[in-house]
Amino acid sequence: MNIAIIGSGIAGLTCAWRLAGHHQVTLFEAGATPGGHTATVDVATPQGTWAIDTGFIVYNDRTYPRFMGLLSELGIGGQKTQMSFSVHNPASGLEYNGHSLTSLFAQRRNLLKPAFWGLLSEIVRFNRLAKLALTEALDPGATLENFLARHRFSPFFARHYILPMGAAIWSSSLQEMRRFPLPLFLRFFEHHGLLDIRDRPQWYVVPGGSREYVRALLARLGDRLDLRLNAPVQQVDRHPTGVTLRLASGEAHFDQVIFACHSAQALAMLAAPTDSEREVLGDIGWQRNEVVLHSDPRWLPARQRAWASWNYRLSDGDCARACVTYNMNILQGLPADAPLFCVTLNPDAPVDDRYVWQRFVYEHPLFNPQSWSAQLRREEINGQQRSWYCGAYWYNGFHEDGVRSALDVVQGIAAAEDN
């Protein structure tokens, strides 16, 4: 068959990798660079040039089996990294990093604070109750806030631990985390070892930057894939005998189309979406997130002992977007003499231009009861009218989910052929 793939993120690339040997495949990318959220930047400094990741950064050996399988097929091994998490409250001055006892009490006065000891006690209690809840039937409509209220967790615990951690993971505000679907939240935390003090998965980065797997995949595909960059698809018309893609350069005709882009983008391209497509794709919301690559240490905790891989900065109120600074020196294992590299998501104040290397905008899916219901209706639209939908937003929003959703589509196309 002649198949069009729209979007060159992890989902689109996985579809291309699996289909290009058996079908005629054309991959359309609106931008100048393939990879989607896999975005590695070369930063030239007096100490040399450094490849720094700004989008997709880490994966682990427990919950990324499909992505690790893809890397293995490409001959790419992982580089071990440290995953740690800190919280800094500029209003109160509180900061801690849960990686070790030294970093946990980087702020020595916390040793004398009953509220801080209470926080540690509530973390243990939350982990225990979360595991217990997972052994029972979970209400699909329950939210994280319902769980916190039912078990009477303190506002201090919510604002200084569980909500910031969730907000950092899903790039959401604290308010959005309160509405987060409880089943999805608890299962994610369990699968990632976040309900345990020990026995956590080993995390990895791609050596040389995450773009290396994109380069390897495209090199291996070679001329089996027709990759078209700077080629935004304006409209998709579907008819009984095929699919027509309309671009600035003209029209292109295919037997099937795979939308490996965001749900909102896919819906906007459809010339005549069905009612189900409008409902399902339209119910998955997206949030715009600003990202700054810089070298300003003021976005990390004041005490270097508290510096973590992920550093959450609390703002007043719950509505502000998640402000997280990734310490790329820790995450990418840069040598001790390397300059400091930080990637800050949604800075809550201007980052000093003297330290800024580059700025980006990414969009991330919003997870709430509405999107949770939409995910469950995916099969209503997948494979209908020669159209297929994949992307990390169909599951938990991470690289593994992009691969998983793509493999769903590949299997669906194979099954449709057999019929």
Give the label of every model feature segment.
Residues 61-182:
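Mobile amphipathic helical/loop "lid" adjacent to a hydrophobic cofactor/ligand pocket
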Residues 187-247, 252:
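Helical element adjacent to the flavin cofactor pocket in flavoenzyme catalytic cores
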Residues 20-44:
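Glycine-rich FAD pyrophosphate-binding loop
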Residues 11, 33, 264:
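Conserved Rossmann-like nucleotide-cofactor binding loop
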Residues 2-27:
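N-terminal Rossmann-like FAD-binding beta1-loop-alpha1 element of flavoenzymes
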Residues 232-363:
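Mid-domain catalytic core of redox enzymes
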Residues 42, 99-100, 319-419:
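Conserved flavin/dinucleotide-binding core of flavoenzymes
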Residues 41-67:
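N-terminal glycine-rich dinucleotide-binding loop that anchors FAD/FMN and/or NAD(P) in oxidoreductases
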